[in-house]
UniProtKB/Swiss-Prot annotation:
Coiled coil: none annotated. This is Probable glycine dehydrogenase (decarboxylating) subunit 2. Its cofactor is pyridoxal 5'-phosphate. It comes from Thermus thermophilus (strain ATCC 27634 / DSM 579 / HB8). The glycine cleavage system is composed of four proteins: P, T, L and H. In this organism, the P 'protein' is a heterodimer of two subunits. The keyword Oxidoreductase applies.
Length: 474
């Protein structure tokens, strides 16, 4: 049965609320140049229709609150509802308020920054970036400003990335004006040290690494990598996508990283299943601190204030002060668990991943890079099975599928990240489902799912010719 869009439910003249008092005309409140030329085409529905519509939509969704969501490299952990209550309390703040009237909010941001610096081993931090990729770009722009300030901006034009890197890494470097060169992985799934040595030199601006990497493996030679980068004058950039594995146990700053971006919407339980809002703070070592974007939240004798007086700053990277309510949720998470709780969360994330990996191996799946897994691992189905078909089959069995076809160096990759918040019984049920799929007829897998609201989408067409609004005829 098809589910009508809210615009298809619209009937002219229907309304959910009737205003009993005259409302001022928009042109009396808003400058003419900021007014729309034509009124917005909003749906006209009564309140009951509206409630049923969105309640119906909620029942057609899959999320962490409804099922196991092992999306690799996304850390789809449970988001405590207490954090939603905390965020709600700040809803009436306005970014144009005098900072003297928002001391509590500024204190929260300052404290969160201190917590994140302590967890990462960084000396200074900005909370401005609104997402992980936004944080990446901010970090690379800081590195670019640093090299330019030293007179090396014209010579250091290359950024190195591993072949297992997130796609946003090379995209970020390219957006910042750099050439990108790929470093291959060695036979154990870690950075090929000899290949890295051949690429390092006075032409390189930075090396971007994720540790643990996207195969779920810790880069055991990270101190050697860091030493080589330092000798070559290369800045070492930490993609914080996988910090959940080492949170409280190891710090990027102690490994030699100069810049780190974090994903509060992953590691620190800010909801992100619907695409945001996210938060990607960027921490730096002291030599890069002058280039951080403005403003920074600082603590002075008379309280907390916003520091715009930073002459070497790369400038603003976002309006106002970051996605503030995401910061509230992350602050609440850290305050709730404390350091010992964060360490336990990381340990459980690793334990769950290792247990689930062994369960899937027993069911017939292969793990091509089978070292000591951290928070996630990459599996392969037996010959003759496609990762895409297995992912669609999982939807039919009531589970969200893992990430498929990434990292690119693993054929038919199934990237699984169970997170720390899942119970042993859930992992076992998922493994049973994965095993059951291998016993399904090929035709069943190729046509799954069967009972979802939408079956197989034309994903290529959706990417190349998106219809972004109801009124878009494209």
């Amino acid at each position: 049965m098809s589910f009508p869009l809210i615009f298809e439910r619209s009937r002219k003249g229907r309304r959910g609320l009737k205003l009993v008092k005259a409302v001022p005309k928009a042109e009396d409140l808003i400058p003419k140049e900021h007014l729309r030329e034509v009124p917005p085409r909003l749906p006209e529905v009564d309140e009951l229709t509206l409630v049923r519509h969105y309640t119906g939509l909620s029942r057609r969704q899959v999320g962490v609150d409804t099922t196991f969501y092992p999306l690799g490299s996304c850390t789809m952990k449970y988001n405590p509802k207490l954090h939603e209550e905390a965020a709600r309390l700040f809803a009436d703040l306005h970014p144009y308020q005098d900072p003297r009237t928002a001391q509590g909010a500024l204190r929260l941001m300052w404290e969160l920054g201190e917590y994140l610096k302590a967890l990462t081993g960084m000396d200074a931090i900005t909370l401005e970036p609104a997402a992980g990729a936004h944080g990446e770009l901010t970090g690379i722009l800081i590195i670019r400003a640093y090299h330019e300030d030293r007179g090396e901006g014209r010579t250091r034009r290359v950024v190195l990335v591993p072949d297992s890197a997130h796609g946003s890494n090379p995209a970020t470097a390219s957006m910042a004006g750099y050439q990108v060169r790929e470093i291959p992985s060695g036979p154990e799934g870690e950075v090929d040290l000899e290949a890295l040595k051949r690429e390092l030199g006075p032409h390189v601006a930075a090396l971007m690494l994720t540790n643990p990497n996207t195969l779920g493996l810790f880069e055991r030679r990270i101190l050697e990598i860091s030493r080589l980068c330092k000798e070559a004058g290369v800045q070492l950039y930490y993609d914080g996508a996988n910090l959940n594995a080492i949170m409280g146990w190891a710090r990027p700053g102690d490994m030699g990283f100069d810049v780190v971006h974090l994903n509060l919407h992953k590691t620190f339980t800010v909801p992100h299943g619907g695409g945001g809002p996210g938060s990607g703070p960027v921490g730096v070592k002291a030599h890069l601190a002058p280039y951080l974007p403005v403003p920074l939240v600082e603590r002075g004798e008379e309280g907390f204030y916003l520091d715009f007086d930073r002459p070497k700053s790369i400038g603003r990277v976002r309006s106002f002060y970051g996605n503030f309510l995401a910061l509230v949720r992350a602050w609440a998470y850290i305050r709730t668990l404390g350091l010992e709780g964060l360490k336990k969360a990381a340990a459980l994330a690793v334990l769950n991943a290792r247990y689930l990996k062994e369960l899937l191996k027993e069911k017939g799946y292969r793990v091509p890079y089978d070292g000591p897994s951290m928070h996630e691992f990459v599996a392969q189905p037996p010959e003759g099975f496609r990762a895409l078909d297995l992912a669609k089959g999982l939807l039919e069995l009531g589970f969200h599928p893992p990430t498929v076809y990434f990292p690119l160096i693993v054929k038919e990759a199934l990237m699984v990240e169970p997170t720390e918040t899942e119970a042993k019984e859930t992992l076992e049920a998922f493994a049973e489902a994965m095993g059951a799929l291998l016993k399904k007829p090929k035709e069943w897998l190729e046509n799954a799912p069967y009972s979802t609201p939408v079956r197989r989408l034309d994903e290529l067409r959706a990417n190349k010719h998106p219809k972004l609004t109801y009124f878009d005829e494209g």
